[in-house]
């Protein structure tokens, strides 16, 4: 049971209907309030001009207002923007906007192979044929916790451990704010739960935020364009599949093909070893023609040997997957580092020859520490991780 009432930004239309009906408001006002917040991105009750004054006063009294405040925006040379956001209790998180131009002669690069199915770009092709300017599609990477409890050896987010979970209003609020900060010609196309924190460790808030972001009366993101990445919390993977019918795109932070290596890199593997994780993936109710994304961070001298690639190919045999190779991005809190390019290419070649769709993720925003594994709790004191034995 919840110990505190739902924040207004976290309420779904049916919850607004119940609370406003109890106040004697007309039935249609619930839809209006939800649309003001989640379709228009307006959080100031005074600006909700089609609502009665008494209702605007009530919303203000309930605490409707900004849930996070942008403190700094770091812009990378490649156009990536990392936003440092201040929460109401003073804690900070980070979210990242990754623009990608699509059109003739350009590379549609969506970080993290963003939303599983990118086969519906006929509108872009038609615009190009008509002579329209290429659109700038944006993927937003959002956080679900202040810090992280998973302790992965190649990731900066957990260097100071978990401080607290984010509320659904703070998770969805990142997208509301990110959408408001889009630049001319940009459109938000994909949201990836790959920022600070383990989304499924904060399951209730993550699931509620998914419902908010995909609700037809709000932003109305297609579930195909929303990806949840997990380090492998097996019961919650099953729960996500059951609650959303497998419609939410799933990404698995795997990073090793044997339990010994994976447990050294990712402590969660000691609780949910590979056989449990693979069983959960086989049971995930994946729609036809959809695949699970396997994220594999290549760490020099740890998991980047071609023999490891062959083990990975064998491990994943029979699963509907695509593989995203991520050369480790340097972080201050770790002595681990990325492999040489030749090593990455050799690893990819093994997987490609084994019949897998395998891509190497292009670095985005690493010059402003916005790349994969670099989002970090502000003020965290690093505990240096040594190379694994």
Swiss-Prot record:
Family to which the UniProt record says this protein belongs: Belongs to the radical SAM superfamily. RlmN family.
Top-level EC class: transferase
The organism of origin for this protein: Sorangium cellulosum (strain So ce56)
CDD domains: Radical_SAM (cd01335)
Binding residues for S-adenosyl-L-methionine: 197-198, 229, 253-255, 329
Protein location: Cytoplasm
Tagged with keyword Transport: no
Catalytic residue list: 94 (proton acceptor), 372 (s-methylcysteine intermediate)
High-level lineage: Bacteria, Pseudomonadati, Myxococcota, Polyangia, Polyangiales
Enzyme Commission identifier(s): 2.1.1.192
Co-factor requirement: [4Fe-4S] cluster
Record's miscellaneous remark: Reaction proceeds by a ping-pong mechanism involving intermediate methylation of a conserved cysteine residue.
Pfam families, sorted: Radical_SAM, RlmN_N
Domain of life: Bacteria
Protein name per its UniProtKB record: Dual-specificity RNA methyltransferase RlmN
